[in-house]
C-alpha cells in the first residue's frame, strides 16, 4: 500500500494553525474529497458535523466551500456526536459524512474523520484517491454545477430517537438517578434527552461548551468531577463521555471507576447468559488480562486486535462477532451501530444491568483486573523492539518468570518516539520488577 501523507488510522488530526490543520488545507480537502466521491460514482451530497471546538466553525466553512467548488451538495448538522454523523450519513443516503473533531484532545487540537455512505470508516482506496486529488490544484466546476449548502435542523431529534431504538420498547430507566458528564462536548444537547426520555432522573455536568473548555477537567479522561457529583447527589451511577461522544466510562454509586475493560466484560457476560453473544469478543493488545481470563471462565472466546477502534472493527468483521472494545471506553456493538457510540454503549450496559437483576458492583465482581504497569521509554527514534535479540531474550526470561498468569507487551508508539513496556500478572511487586528490568534493557538497546 502507498504510504499515506495525511491520513492516519483515524483520519487527520493536529494542532489548529499547524499544517495540515489550517483553513487552506481544509478548503483543498473538501474539494479533493468531492472529486474522489464523484468519480467513485457515489451520491452527490456530503454531511458535515462537528464537536464544540471554536475552530470547528472555521473548518466547517472551509470544507463546505471546497465541496461546493467540486459540485457537491452539503448538509450541515452543527454540533453532533461522531456516531450521530455516521448514523445520519446512512439515513440521508449521502455520499459520505465528515466529522470535525479531535475527540478527547484539548480545544487547541482539531481533526477530520470521514464516514462512508454505509456509516463505516472509509476504505483505504478511497482515502488514497482523496490524497491523490490533494496533490492537484483546485479547479472550480462550472457555475451552474456548484454545490448547494443547507442546514439540518432536526438532526439532534433524529439521533435521540435512534439511540432509544437500540433498546427494547419495554426498557425504561424509571427510578434511576444518573449523572451525565458531557465533557462540554458534542453530546451536551442530546445525551440528557435520551436518558430523560427513557425515564431516568438526570443530573448533568460538563454541558456548557464555550468553544475552549471541551474535555477541560471533565469527561471520560477526567473523572474527578463526575465522582464528586455522584457522591453529592447520591446518584445510582455516573456516565462520562468524551468530547465527540464515541467513548464512555462510568462511575459506580460508591465512587469507583468502571473502565472500558469492565464495561466490555459486563456486556459480554450478560449477553452470553442470555444466549445473545453470537461468538467471541475482541479487545486490544492493551486490554487487561483479567478480561480474557474471566471470559474464558464462562466459555467466551477472546481475541486481541491492534490498538484502535478501526482494528477492533476489522477483527469483529473477520470473525462475524458482535462486540469489541478498548479500556479507554471505545465499544463497538455491531448489532446496534456501525461505529463506537458512547450513548448507545451506555444504554446497552444499563440494559444488561437491568436484565441481570444485579447491581453494577455485582456484575463487575465477575472479573478481577490483574495488576498492570507500563513504562514509556523515550528513544531517539522509533524502532521495533522485537527486532533486537537482547530485548527478545530479556522478554522471554520475564515471561517465564510470570508463567501462564502473566503477560508482557513491548511496542513502539505510533505517534511519539517511545517504546511502551507493559506487563500484567498476579503480583504487583513482580510486575513492577519485570517492567523496570525490561525498560532498562530497552534503554541500553536504544540506537
Swiss-Prot record:
SUPFAM superfamilies: Phosphoglucomutase, C-terminal domain, Phosphoglucomutase, first 3 domains
Keyword Ribonucleoprotein found: no
Catalytic residues (positions): 103
GO biological process, one term: UDP-N-acetylglucosamine biosynthetic process
Class of the enzyme per the UniProt entry, highest EC level: isomerase
UniProt superkingdom: Bacteria
Enzyme Commission number(s): 5.4.2.10
Modification Phosphoserine, positions: 103
PROSITE patterns: PGM_PMM
Molecular functions (GO terms): magnesium ion binding; phosphoglucosamine mutase activity; phosphomannomutase activity
UniProt signal peptide: none
Matching CDD domains: GlmM (cd05802)
Pfam family, one: PGM_PMM_II
Maturation and modification: Activated by phosphorylation.
Catalytic activity: alpha-D-glucosamine 1-phosphate = D-glucosamine 6-phosphate
Entry keyword Plastid: no
Cofactor(s) this protein requires: Mg(2+)
Positions annotated to bind Mg(2+): 103, 242, 244, 246
Keywords: Isomerase, Magnesium, Metal-binding, Phosphoprotein
Cofactor: how and how many bound: Binds 1 Mg(2+) ion per subunit.
Gene Ontology CC: cytosol
Family: Belongs to the phosphohexose mutase family.
Protein purpose: Catalyzes the conversion of glucosamine-6-phosphate to glucosamine-1-phosphate.
Protein name in UniProt: Phosphoglucosamine mutase
Phylogenetic lineage: Bacteria, Pseudomonadati, Pseudomonadota, Gammaproteobacteria, Pseudomonadales
Amino acid at each position: 500500500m502507498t504510504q499515506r501523507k495525511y491520513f492516519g488510522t483515524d483520519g487527520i488530526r493536529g494542532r489548529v494553525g499547524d499544517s495540515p490543520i489550517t483553513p487552506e488545507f481544509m478548503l483543498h480537502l473538501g474539494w479533493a474529497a468531492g472529486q474522489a466521491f464523484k468519480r467513485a460514482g457515489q451520491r452527490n451530497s456530503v454531511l458535515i458535523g462537528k464537536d464544540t471546538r471554536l475552530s470547528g466553525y472555521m473548518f466547517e466553512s472551509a470544507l463546505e466551500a471546497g465541496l461546493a467548488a467540486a459540485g457537491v451538495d452539503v448538509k450541515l448538522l452543527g454540533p453532533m456526536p461522531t456516531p450521530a454523523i455516521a448514523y445520519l450519513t446512512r439515513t440521508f443516503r449521502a455520499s459520505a459524512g465528515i466529522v470535525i473533531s479531535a475527540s478527547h484532545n484539548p480545544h487547541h487540537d482539531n481533526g477530520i474523520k470521514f464516514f462512508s455512505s454505509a456509516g463505516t470508516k472509509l476504505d483505504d482506496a478511497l482515502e488514497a484517491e482523496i490524497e491523490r486529488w490533494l496533490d492537484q490544484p483546485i479547479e472550480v466546476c462550472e457555475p451552474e454545477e456548484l454545490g448547494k449548502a443547507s442546514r439540518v435542523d432536526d438532526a439532534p431529534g433524529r439521533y435521540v430517537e435512534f439511540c432509544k431504538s437500540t433498546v427494547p420498547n419495554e426498557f425504561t430507566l424509571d427510578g434511576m438517578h444518573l449523572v451525565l458528564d458531557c465533557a462540554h462536548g458534542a453530546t451536551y444537547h442530546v445525551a440528557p434527552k435520551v436518558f430523560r426520555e427513557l425515564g431516568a432522573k438526570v443530573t448533568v455536568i460538563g454541558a456548557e461548551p464555550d468553544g475552549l473548555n471541551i474535555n477541560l477537567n471533565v469527561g471520560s479522561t477526567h473523572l474527578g468531577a463526575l465522582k464528586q457529583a455522584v457522591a453529592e447527589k447520591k446518584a445510582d451511577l455516573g456516565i462520562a463521555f468524551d468530547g465527540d461522544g464515541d467513548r464512555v466510562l462510568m462511575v459506580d454509586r460508591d465512587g469507583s471507576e468502571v473502565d472500558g475493560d469492565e464495561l466490555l466484560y459486563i456486556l459480554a457476560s450478560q449477553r452470553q447468559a442470555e444466549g445473545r453473544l453470537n461468538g467471541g469478543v475482541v479487545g486490544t493488545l492493551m486490554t487487561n488480562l483479567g478480561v480474557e481470563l474471566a471470559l474464558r471462565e464462562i466459555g467466551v472466546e477472546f481475541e486481541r486486535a491492534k490498538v484502535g477502534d478501526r482494528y477492533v472493527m476489522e477483527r469483529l468483521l473477520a470473525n462475524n462477532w458482535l462486540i469489541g472494545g478498548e479500556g479507554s471506553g471505545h465499544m463497538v456493538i455491531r448489532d446496534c451501530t456501525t461505529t463506537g457510540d458512547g450513548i448507545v454503549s451506555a444504554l446497552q450496559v444499563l440494559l444488561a444491568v437491568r436484565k441481570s437483576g444485579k447491581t453494577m458492583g455485582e456484575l463487575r465482581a465477575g472479573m478481577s483486573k490483574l495488576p498492570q504497569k507500563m513504562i514509556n521509554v523515550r528513544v531517539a527514534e522509533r524502532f521495533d523492539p522485537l527486532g533486537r535479540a537482547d530485548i527478545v531474550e530479556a522478554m522471554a526470561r520475564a515471561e517465564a518468570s510470570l508463567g501462564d498468569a502473566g503477560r508482557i507487551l513491548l511496542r513502539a508508539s505510533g505517534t511519539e518516539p517511545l517504546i511502551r513496556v507493559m506487563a500484567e500478572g498476579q503480583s504487583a511487586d513482580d510486575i513492577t520488577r519485570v517492567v523496570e528490568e525490561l525498560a532498562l534493557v530497552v534503554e541500553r538497546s536504544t540506537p
